């Protein structure tokens, strides 16, 4: 059948038919307005209760058929743990009240649906349908095995889960537990490639002589459906703030869209001024605790200076 933004979870994933999320629509879920919990530390369930190190019940240091998910260098998770992650999400409690709360869950759920629907993995799908023909040749999941680590910025010195320098593997623990391929995390890139992808969005699905999707698709995703409820989000995309605080300098068109990332990334496209702004940092290195990048508004201050320079 046809999937629209009003399609409910139970209509695309039969396992959700008896879930408290059965009536959640794609629109509300991707606008982060569906009472879904922000995240779940799945990795914590796999640590030894005494040593707090990865438990032998779940991990091995050598790959085998049963332990096939590489979460970092020489550490392999049980292959069947993917099902456990999906079950934890499906059975999770809803938040007590309906309000805007960013959640990673929609991207776990929809990754499962997309891979099932296309009978292919997400990393293959985006490579074949987008990155390759966009000429985004440095954009990929799991670069560790594909390009030299000298070209990859290290992510974090992890002292709570993987207990090593995470380098060439995704920072997000939940994505690492999905073999590095998350719907919400895991893509490595450089500023030039991200700019190509954002330019394709800016041109409503058209880039380099090729149409990737219809202009009206971008328009539907770049719409704030719950602005009247105080939720600024588009579908997947973040949008400029409605009040004081938010993801942009506050000096930018409401038609603009983009996203920021936990590890220090930021990409924003403004159709009015035809500007794409990309900022990439590894702010989680050496550790993720101190978020000076956010506290000092560095990404949005640079954005403000760009706009001041144009307007002047």
Model regions: which residues?
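Short, conserved catalytic-motif segment at the N-terminal edge
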Residues: 18, 165, 172, 288-289, ...
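Glycine-centered, phosphate/nucleic-acid-interacting loop/turn motifs that mediate DNA/RNA or nucleotide
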Residues: 1
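Short, glycine/proline-biased beta-turn/loop segments that scaffold the active-site neighborhood
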Residues: 4-19, 132-133
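A short, well-structured edge-of-sheet supersecondary motif
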Residues: 5, 72-78, 139, 267-270, ...
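Structured C-terminal helix/loop/strand segments within mature extracytoplasmic catalytic/sensor domains
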Residues: 259-312
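Short, surface-exposed loop or secondary-structure junction motifs
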Residues: 21-254
């Amino acid at each position: 059948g046809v999937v629209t933004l009003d399609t409910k979870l139970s209509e695309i994933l039969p396992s959700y038919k008896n879930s408290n999320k059965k009536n959640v629509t794609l629109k509300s879920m991707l606008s982060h307005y569906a009472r879904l919990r922000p995240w779940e530390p799945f990795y914590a369930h796999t640590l030894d209760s005494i040593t707090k190190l990865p438990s032998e019940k779940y991990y091995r240091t050598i790959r085998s058929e049963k332990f096939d998910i590489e979460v970092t260098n020489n550490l392999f998770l049980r292959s069947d743990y993917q099902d456990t992650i999906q079950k934890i999400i499906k059975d999770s409690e809803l938040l007590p009240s309906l309000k805007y709360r960013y959640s990673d869950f929609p991207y776990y759920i929809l990754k499962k649906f997309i891979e099932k629907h296309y009978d292919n993995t997400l990393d293959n799908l985006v490579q074949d349908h987008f990155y390759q023909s966009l000429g985004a040749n440095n954009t990929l999941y799991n670069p560790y095995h594909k390009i030299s680590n000298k070209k990859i910025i290290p992510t974090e010195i992890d002292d709570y889960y993987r207990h090593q320098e995470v380098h060439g593997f995704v920072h997000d623990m939940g994505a690492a537990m999905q073999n590095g391929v998350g719907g919400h995390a895991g893509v490595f890139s450089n500023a030039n490639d991200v700019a190509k992808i954002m330019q394709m969005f800016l041109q409503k699905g058209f880039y380099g002589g090729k149409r990737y999707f219809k202009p009206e698709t971008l328009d539907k995703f770049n719409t704030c459906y719950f602005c009247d409820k105080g939720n600024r989000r588009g579908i997947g995309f973040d949008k400029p703030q409605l009040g004081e605080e938010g993801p942009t300098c506050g000096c930018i068109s409401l038609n603009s869209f983009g996203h920021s990332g936990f590890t220090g990334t930021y990409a924003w496209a403004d159709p009015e001024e035809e500007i794409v702004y990309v900022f990439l940092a590894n702010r989680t290195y050496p550790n993720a605790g101190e978020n000076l990048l956010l506290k000092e508004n560095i990404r949005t201050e640079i954005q403000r200076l760009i706009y001041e320079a144009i307007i002047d």
